[in-house]
């Protein structure tokens, strides 16, 4: 009993090398226009990697450093931890050095560095730069060993003590806030949200559907989880404009609300290939020769922090298996449901899947087989349940030819045998 709904993680397929001659439609750029333009283009590079990172590099950005410094807090949150640690240490060390220099200059101008002078010092026991640096550390960290202290001899020294205390509080608040914000980022939550290696196209409820599977490895829920998908493909407009990366939304039930999912067990997300789908005119052969990328997105709020997280992956055309379904992963036990993640990425072939496009199927150009074959998913689920019941009842497998009680051996041939469906192994 597989999951009832239809929507990360995949093996990165090898990219084709070299250049190829592609035929692009001028009308809409998806192979169903009348006018054809032959152009030589390079095989598509993955826009979104399988781990969710975008394969994009920014170049020639004007005033990049100034723009990043203007938003220093976000910059500190986004940088790596090693640089965050460097900024953390430098912020304190530089502030201690700055105020240490200030107190050393105050002592120098007041003549406190002259040990022969008997007048009252601005800061007692500060007669060198090292002593001034230690006094700066003691002031900002409120250590207060008791040997060095400011006096009322110099108002400027009193002001600098107050000013350093305020600056120290600001640095503490900024650094601690940035560290906490970085720790609370739900970025690592994506590691426990997985997409299937491949997407599949198969019949569901009499219609061709594009499907992919998503799962949550944690027991903590993803609140308000919902899915989105986009098809990325280059095309040429009717005016001759070349769009290298055209983004087309793929409907996964936004209008009906089924894009919002309850992600407790793995769920199969379904896109019905109808007349509004960008895959409506594509057959199996077209998919095999196509050059596009489907980006899938899962969004939701982390239950522990209530922060929004986004998990991404993508499927190239050669990662879409036509005529396959996912093996079931959800099984009903006696008092609970069991999820077997060893089957999460596995698929099996459905022989009766039409090879034509959804348009041809809707226009009755392809006759569906009426053969009522027992579904492999149900067979796996029922077999698992029967084996569990047999193990609980302690019924051993009998190899004896003894007949059951109450049945005559001469009339045994008239007793109908229990129909057992033939098991077909999964072809992955």
Swiss-Prot record:
Keywords: Cell membrane, Ion channel, Ion transport, Membrane, Potassium, Potassium transport, S-nitrosylation, Transmembrane, Transmembrane helix, Transport, Voltage-gated channel. The record marks 172 as: Role in the control of polyamine-mediated channel gating and in the blocking by intracellular magnesium. A motif (PDZ-binding) lies at residues 426-428. Residues 107-128, 148-156 are extracellular. Residues 181-208 are annotated as: Polyphosphoinositide (PIP2)-binding. It is a multi-pass membrane protein. Activated by phosphatidylinositol 4,5 biphosphate (PtdIns(4,5)P2). It is found in: Cell membrane; Cell membrane, Sarcolemma, T-tubule. Belongs to the inward rectifier-type potassium channel (TC 1.A.2.1) family. KCNJ2 subfamily. This is Inward rectifier potassium channel 2. The lineage of its organism: Eukaryota, Metazoa, Chordata, Craniata, Vertebrata.
């Amino acid at each position: 009993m597989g999951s009832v709904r239809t929507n990360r993680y995949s093996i990165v397929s090898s990219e084709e090398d070299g250049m190829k001659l592609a035929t692009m439609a001028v009308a809409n750029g998806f192979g169903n226009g009348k006018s054809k333009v032959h152009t030589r283009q390079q095989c598509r590079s993955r826009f979104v990697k399988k781990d969710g990172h975008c394969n994009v590099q920014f170049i020639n950005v004007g005033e990049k450093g100034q723009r990043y410094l203007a938003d220093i807090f976000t910059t500190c949150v986004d940088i790596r931890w090693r640089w965050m640690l460097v900024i953390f240490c430098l912020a304190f060390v530089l502030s201690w050095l700055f105020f240490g220099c200030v107190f050393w200059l105050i002592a120098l101008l007041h003549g406190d560095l002259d040990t022969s002078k008997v007048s009252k010092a601005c800061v007692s026991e500060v007669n060198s730069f090292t002593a001034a640096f230690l006094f700066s550390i003691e002031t900002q960290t409120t250590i207060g060993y008791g040997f060095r202290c400011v006096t009322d001899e110099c108002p400027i020294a009193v002001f600098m003590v107050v000013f350093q205390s305020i600056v120290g509080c600001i640095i503490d608040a900024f650094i601690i806030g940035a560290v906490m914000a970085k720790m609370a980022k739900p970025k690592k939550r994506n590691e426990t949200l997985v997409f299937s290696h491949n997407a599949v196209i198969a019949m569901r409820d009499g219609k061709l559907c594009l499907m992919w599977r998503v799962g949550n490895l944690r027991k903590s829920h993803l609140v308000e989880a919902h899915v989105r998908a986009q098809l990325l493909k280059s095309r040429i407009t009717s005016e001759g404009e070349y769009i290298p990366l055209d983004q087309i939304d793929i409907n996964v039930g936004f209008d009906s609300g089924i894009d919002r999912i309850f992600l407790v067990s793995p769920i199969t997300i379904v896109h019905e290939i109808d007349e509004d789908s960008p895959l409506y005119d594509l057959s199996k052969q077209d998919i095999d020769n196509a050059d596009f990328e489907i980006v899938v997105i899962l969004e939701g709020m982390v239950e522990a922090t209530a922060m929004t997280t986004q998990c991404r992956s993508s499927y190239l055309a050669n990662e879409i298996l036509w005529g396959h379904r996912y093996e079931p992963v959800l099984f009903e036990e006696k008092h609970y449901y069991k999820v077997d993640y060893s089957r999460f990425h596995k698929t099996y072939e459905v022989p009766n899947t039409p090879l034509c496009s959804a348009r041809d199927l809707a226009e009755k150009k392809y006759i569906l087989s009426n053969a009522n074959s027992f579904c492999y998913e149900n067979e796996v689920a029922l077999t698992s349940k029967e084996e569990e019941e047999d193990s609980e009842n302690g019924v051993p497998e009998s190899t004896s030819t003894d007949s059951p009680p109450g049945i005559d051996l001469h009339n045994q041939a008239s007793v109908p045998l229990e129909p057992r469906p033939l098991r077909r192994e999964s072809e992955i």
